[in-house]
């Protein structure tokens, strides 16, 4: 009987199987029940290559409706709502009280203010128009009041051929003669040939004389504009009444004033 065949290790496989390699022991990830040190733990992180992020503690958080737990690190935490949720009840009560107070204050202001003056008509008058009308009315009243109280009464004076106008105060004169002499001095450089503006002639005093002939004897005559915008010769009214209705004065040539005559001459001519 032949002896049994025995395996022979020609290439050294039995020795390699008996001694484990260090690479296989280091790469093994199974737990070592003998308490030996395990290999480094591999984790997936976000960052640049070679940078080390701080260690963070893994916290198992469930799905809850309460506030977020306080964060431990600022770098790894996200922005969250401020920790004011426990005071939500108190703050809502204060907000409601403030809103009620604002409504109480706004209630009286909702009523429209009483208008000072109701505008009648259409289209309505703008504010600046109302102010202008009121100012003009008050100015007219002031002028009438000043005239009634004896204030200055200035009127414009113009002359045929004179390039400028003058103003005189009728309250400073007491008669037509004083006014005529004052105007003659003002326009002395334009008046020639006559010593007075309103020097009446014999024909002017006669009621049966022609008014055109009476005016031809004078080089210049003094006329005025009354309240009705009519031009009349000076001297047909009493002086006090003349100062109240005179608006403008004009020194005209006698030939141009042939169609203008005092009211007394016109009335006498119509009566005849």
Curated annotation (Swiss-Prot):
Domain PB1 intervals: 152-256
Any single Pfam family the record assigns to this protein: AUX_IAA
Keyword Transcription regulation in annotation: yes
InterPro entries xrefs: AUX/IAA_dom, AUX_IAA, PB1-like
GO cellular component: nucleus
Renumbered ranges of motif EAR-like (transcriptional repression): 44-48
Disordered: annotated span: 1-92
Keyword Electron transport attributed: no
Subcellular location: Nucleus
Compositionally biased intervals (Low complexity): 14-33, 40-50
Induction or repression: Not induced by auxin.
Record keywords, A-Z: Auxin signaling pathway, Nucleus, Repressor, Transcription, Transcription regulation
Signal sequence range: none
Domain of life: Eukaryota
PROSITE patterns hit by this protein: PB1
One of the protein's GO biological processes: regulation of DNA-templated transcription
Biological role stated in the UniProt entry: Aux/IAA proteins are short-lived transcriptional factors that function as repressors of early auxin response genes at low auxin concentrations.
Self-association and partners: Homodimers and heterodimers.
Protein family: Belongs to the Aux/IAA family.
Protein name per Swiss-Prot or TrEMBL: Auxin-responsive protein IAA5
Organism name: Oryza sativa subsp. indica
